[in-house]
């Protein structure tokens, strides 16, 4: 038996001049996992709303701050999640970032912080991140390493 699921989203982006540089902000909405059951199980649909602001201090240094909210459905998964994070890109090459996820321990999503760093050496990008979570959180002792090509 087949199944179909769709995700829908939209975003709005606006640039503006601040401190002789072009700052920008973005706001977006997403509805995900909308569709029929998969192997007899309903997918946990998600409604999301988020925004970010990008503040350049110079051509080589910028700060990005983001905030998002997600509401999960159906009833057995129903709860609100939120996240906030910041990333500072310095000298065009180095990146440091941090964030915090607000979840629901009873639903298995938990609260945890994240720290990360990265390097951009065009066309290569490398990132490392680590989750700061309690022992009973699913993100406990989680780290990620990513290497990519920018084009």
In which residue ranges do the predicted regions lie?
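Loop-centered beta-sheet repeat module
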Residues: 1-39, 43
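Outer membrane beta-barrel transmembrane domains
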Residues: 26-28, 39-151
């Amino acid at each position: 038996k087949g199944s179909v699921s769709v995700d829908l989203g939209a975003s709005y982006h606006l640039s503006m001049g601040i401190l002789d540089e072009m700052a920008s902000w973005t706001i977006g909405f997403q509805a995900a996992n909308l569709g029929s059951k998969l192997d007899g199980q309903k997918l946990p649909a998600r409604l999301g709303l988020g925004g970010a602001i990008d503040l350049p201090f110079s051509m080589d240094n910028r700060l990005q701050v983001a905030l998002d909210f997600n509401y999960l459905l159906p009833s057995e998964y129903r709860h609100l999640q939120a996240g906030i994070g910041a990333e500072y890109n310095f000298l065009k090459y180095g990146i440091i970032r941090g964030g915090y996820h607000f979840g629901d321990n009873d639903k298995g999503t938990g609260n945890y912080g994240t720290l990360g760093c990265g390097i951009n050496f065009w066309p290569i990008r490398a990132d490392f991140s680590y989750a700061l979570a309690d022992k009973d959180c699913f993100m406990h002792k989680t780290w990620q390493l990513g290497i990519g090509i920018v084009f």
